[in-house]
Amino acid sequence: MATVRRTVQAPPASVYKVLADGWTYSDWVVGTTHIRDVDPSWPAPGARLHHKAGPWPLSLNDTSTVVAVEPDRSLELRAGLWPLGEATVRITLEPAGMSATVVSMHEDFRAGPLHWVKNKINDLVLHRRNIETLRRLADIAERGTRLRAPTDRSPGSPR
């Protein structure tokens, strides 16, 4: 089981926008190498994200399914990586001031061999992986916020 937190310099709506775009998952979820398809109803409960994980030629095809969602607040997934197992991943978004978000990610294997061999080494690896996952998520959400930041570029304004 691993829980990590990161303060992202973007409002919850901006972070959620990244979560709600299933096609971005290979950009920020460590280990996901390719998104094969995203159900049109993503991120509604029951919607699936079809992905590849791991290095080629050993990559595995699987799916992740939305269990619960509260727009701009949380997303819970059942993430598959069979034959290794299946995890529950819960991402929560808490406002931190006017333009920041505390993102928490909790992941726990619930089935398969990775569930059976719970130990400190697995927890440490999962913890480090999820720190990097949230760093990548922050990069995307913060970049989107900077691109949308209002600027006054009217003629005669100082640059």
Feature-to-residue mapping (PLM):
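Short beta-strand segments that buttress and anchor functional surface loops
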Residues: 47-54, 75-82
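Hydrophobic/aromatic beta-strand elements that line small-molecule binding cavities or substrate pockets
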Residues: 6, 62-68, 87-95
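Hydrophobic ligand-binding cavity/cleft-lining segments
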Residues: 1-44, 156-159
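A short, structured loop/turn motif at beta-sheet edges
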Residues: 12-13, 40-43, 67-72, 92-102
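Beta-strand/loop substructures that line and gate deep hydrophobic ligand-binding cavities in soluble
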Residues: 78-132, 148-150
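Intrinsic-disorder/low-complexity, polar/charged segments enriched in Ser/Thr/Lys/Arg/Asp/Glu/Gln
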Residues: 1-7, 13, 48, 61, ...
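Short, highly charged C-terminal tails/helix-capping segments
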Residues: 37, 138-159
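Hydrophobic pocket/interface hotspot
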Residues: 15-19, 25, 49, 66, ...
